UniProtKB/Swiss-Prot annotation:
Species per Swiss-Prot/TrEMBL record: Homo sapiens (Human)
Binding-site list for substrate: T143, D176, R201, S225, W331, R362, H365, Y367
Catalytic activity: L-seryl-[protein] + UDP-N-acetyl-alpha-D-galactosamine = a 3-O-[N-acetyl-alpha-D-galactosaminyl]-L-seryl-[protein] + UDP + H(+); L-threonyl-[protein] + UDP-N-acetyl-alpha-D-galactosamine = a 3-O-[N-acetyl-alpha-D-galactosaminyl]-L-threonyl-[protein] + UDP + H(+)
Disordered: annotated span: 53-74
Cytoplasmic topological intervals: 1-6
Record gene name: GALNT2
Residues carrying covalently attached carbohydrate according to the record: S29
Disulfide bonds: C126-C354, C345-C423, C456-C473, C496-C513, C539-C555
Comment field on protein domains: There are two conserved domains in the glycosyltransferase region: the N-terminal domain (domain A, also called GT1 motif), which is probably involved in manganese coordination and substrate binding and the C-terminal domain (domain B, also called Gal/GalNAc-T motif), which is probably involved in catalytic reaction and UDP-Gal binding.
Residues at the site labelled Not glycosylated: N516
Database matches in SUPFAM superfamilies: Nucleotide-diphospho-sugar transferases, Ricin B-like lectins
Segments for region (Catalytic subdomain B): 300-362
Lumenal topological domain: 25-571
Protein name per its UniProtKB record: Polypeptide N-acetylgalactosaminyltransferase 2
Pfam family name, one: Ricin_B_lectin
């Protein structure tokens, strides 16, 4: 009897111990209700808020697995990386120009934590959205040359901190022959970071291709070296590529102020575009496009062009499509070339509103270009224009006449690539992808903005019988888009500049264009630097712009009479 009692007590003890272990290990948390769980109520998984559910999934699964994972010898997790030791040796000394090295305020950059908090700038709908659980992992390729260590470190840490661990296969840093090899080498201690160093300066395109060739994941993510990734930035990008491997997708690029490093959310109503000078610009969506998105403001945005610094792409599609033009140098024009190539060869470009990544926008480059930045950009741009733009390349040469004098090298392999991929003509691109870009008419002598210094001729929103004025050039067309025709009319849509009174000081009016109306006849004189009214021999003048509008005055050397079209089609 005593023996049986002893056995029962032992069994009871083991049973209690087992229950305690079960509760402690989390298996009975639903039964226990948890601290503050509310009167022992069971928390049903289907009733948990989606965001909380996602966090629970990560914390109970991926992060636990990551914490148990053994790191390779010499590697550390990013929270254990010594930021002070890495950044400290390159900090700006007292009296030094904080902008000298990087063309942004390095002192402010160096003050920030490598994992600083930034505002979540996503739309509310994005914060409630659930992403596919079977997304492919990505290799993140970051190229740099003499980047500020604090900015480079924040880029790497933000990728690791703001991404589900299982979606980051690796971060490949390609050091494009920086002066100090340790800028990259020291970061190789961080988990998942691989460092490749060029043995000479190669430039952005060839460096990115080297990183892509070394990548082990099926999806490539290209980032600049002065970025900060926002909450759940990666999942929406990977999801779009997983659904269609011919999509090339970019986040909304938020602004990191170059002076104080404040993080500011960018508008979600922008698309990438360009003028005929082939310089990238941001275009606002048309009112019709904005209205069509009111029901789903976080839907992907088809964009004619990507900025080029930040995008995600299927690795095999990147290879099939011809990677980058390896004959392009340093920086510039590569986003133009890859955008044309993707669209014309069967792919598409998208901006994904639920993905946000901050980027430091600078006013000038901190590094040197062999032969000068203008020459390198013109050479790269000419290569893109000659391969992809067909006869429309002539509008580029009209906008940038000096580009004709810049040798662009051999493009035979790129022309063969275009033929092999059965790519569409540029006319198709203009009609189907970028109809907003105005194409000069065959009757036009000059086209585009009519510039006077930093100001441009502007309708000021006026219509028939309204005056015209000048306004700061915005490079967005619209009220500042004009054409000088072979019939000598200065046109804005169906309205023409009209001299109502042929006396000096008379205001110019917008009136409906009429054939053979002498009041609407203009010609360019003095090397296309002035506009003279044919009937009165008076010149277009802006001296009275602030007091009422533009006028005609006796032609003279005044700066108020200097005007230049962005495209002169007859040089």
């Amino acid at each position: 009897m005593r023996r049986r009692s002893r056995m029962l007590l032992c069994f009871a003890f083991l049973w209690v111990l087992g229950i305690a272990y079960y509760m402690y290990s989390g298996g009975g948390s639903a039964l226990a209700g948890g601290a503050g769980g509310g009167a022992g109520r069971k928390e049903d998984w289907n009733e948990i808020d989606p965001i909380k559910k996602k966090d629970l999934h990560h914390s109970n699964g991926e992060e636990k697995a990551q914490s148990m994972e053994t790191l390779p010898p010499g590697k550390v997790r990013w929270p254990d990386f010594n930021q002070e030791a890495y950044v400290g040796g390159t900090m700006v000394r007292s009296g030094q120009d904080p902008y000298a090295r990087n063309k942004f305020n390095q002192v402010e950059s160096d003050k920030l934590r490598m994992d600083r908090a930034i505002p979540d700038t996503r739309h509310d709908q994005c914060q409630r959205k659930q992403w596919r659980v079977d997304l492919p992992a990505t290799s993140v390729v970051i190229t740099f040359h003499n980047e500020a260590r604090s900015a480079l470190l924040r880029t790497v840490v933000s990728v690791l901190k703001k991404s589900p661990p299982h979606l980051i296969k690796e971060i490949i840093l390609v050091d494009d022959y920086s002066n100090d090899p340790e800028d990259g080498a020291l970061l190789g201690k961080i988990e998942k970071v691989r460092v490749l160093r060029n043995d000479r300066r190669e430039g952005l395109m060839r460096s990115r291709v080297r990183g892509a060739d070394a990548a082990q994941a099926k999806v490539l993510t290209f980032l600049d070296s002065h970025c900060e990734c926002n909450e759940h930035w990666l999942e929406p990008l990977l999801e779009r590529v997983a659904e269609d491997r011919t999509r090339v997708v970019s986040p909304i690029i938020d602004v990191i102020n170059m002076d104080n490093f404040q993080y500011v959310g960018a508008s979600a109503d922008l698309k990438g575009g360009f003028d005929w000078n082939l310089v990238f610009k941001w275009d606002y969506m048309t009112p019709e496009q904005r209205r069509s998105r009111q029901g789903n403001p976080v839907a992907p945005i088809k964009t004619p062009m990507i900025a080029g610094g930040l995008f995600v792409m299927d690795k095999f599609y990147f290879e099939e499509l011809g990677k980058y033009d390896m004959m392009m140098d340093v920086w510039g024009g590569e986003n133009l070339e890859i955008s044309f190539r993707v669209w014309q060869c069967g792919g598409s470009l998208e901006i994904i509103p639920c993905s946000r990544v901050g980027h430091v926008f600078r006013k000038q480059h901190p590094y040197t270009f062999p032969g000068g930045s203008g020459t390198v950009f013109a050479r790269n741009t000419r290569r893109a224009a000659e391969v992809w733009m067909d006869e429309y390349k002539n509008f580029y040469y009209a906008a940038v006449p000096s580009a004709r004098n810049v040798p662009y090298g051999n493009i035979q392999s790129r022309l063969e690539l275009r033929k092999k991929l059965s790519c569409k003509p540029f006319k198709w691109y203009l009609e189907n992808v970028y109809p907003e870009l105005r194409v000069p008419d065959h009757q036009d002598i000059a086209f585009g903005a009519l510039q006077q210094g930093t100001n441009c001729l502007d309708t000021l929103g006026h219509f028939a019988d309204g005056v015209v004025g000048v306004y700061e050039c915005h490079n967005a067309g619209g009220n500042q888009e004009w054409a000088l025709t072979k019939e000598k009319s200065v046109k804005h849509m169906d309205l023409c500049l009209t001299v109502v009174d042929r006396a000096p000081g008379s205001l110019i009016k917008l009136q409906g264009c009429r054939e053979n109306d002498s009041r609407q006849k203009w010609e360019q004189i003095e090397g296309n630097s002035k506009l003279r009214h044919v009937g009165s021999n008076l010149c277009l003048d802006s001296r009275t712009a602030k007091s009422g509008g533009l006028s005609v005055e006796v032609c003279g050397p005044a700066l108020s009479q200097q005007w230049k079209f962005t495209l002169n089609l007859q040089q």
